[in-house]
């Protein structure tokens, strides 16, 4: 069984885990509705980049 020769220091341990972190979502404000939305996603009103892409039923 493989066993490490020397103890990994706290610094090297943390550097090894540097990619294991949470990313902050890229949130912006929609131009048409003024609501928050994820970048490069359609807002709940069906708008993308100021243009209506999808017809949204208002009964929902």
UniProtKB/Swiss-Prot annotation:
Keyword Cytoplasm: no
Claim: Ubl conjugation is one of the keywords in the record: no
Superkingdom of source: Bacteria
GO cellular component: large ribosomal subunit
UniProt keyword terms in alphabetical order: Ribonucleoprotein, Ribosomal protein
GO MF annotation list: structural constituent of ribosome
GO biological process: translation
Family, as annotated: Belongs to the bacterial ribosomal protein bL32 family.
HAMAP family: Ribosomal_bL32
NCBIfam families: rpmF_bact
Name of the protein this chain belongs to: Large ribosomal subunit protein bL32
Native source species: Ehrlichia ruminantium (strain Gardel)
The organism's taxonomic lineage, starting at the top: Bacteria, Pseudomonadati, Pseudomonadota, Alphaproteobacteria, Rickettsiales
Gene name in the database record: rpmF
């Amino acid at each position: 069984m493989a066993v490490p020769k020397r103890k990994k220091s706290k610094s090297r341990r943390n550097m090894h885990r540097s990619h294991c972190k949470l990313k902050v979502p890229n949130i912006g404000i929609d131009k048409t509705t003024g609501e928050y939305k994820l970048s490069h996603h359609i807002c709940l009103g069906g708008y993308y980049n100021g243009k209506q892409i999808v017809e949204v039923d208002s009964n929902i």
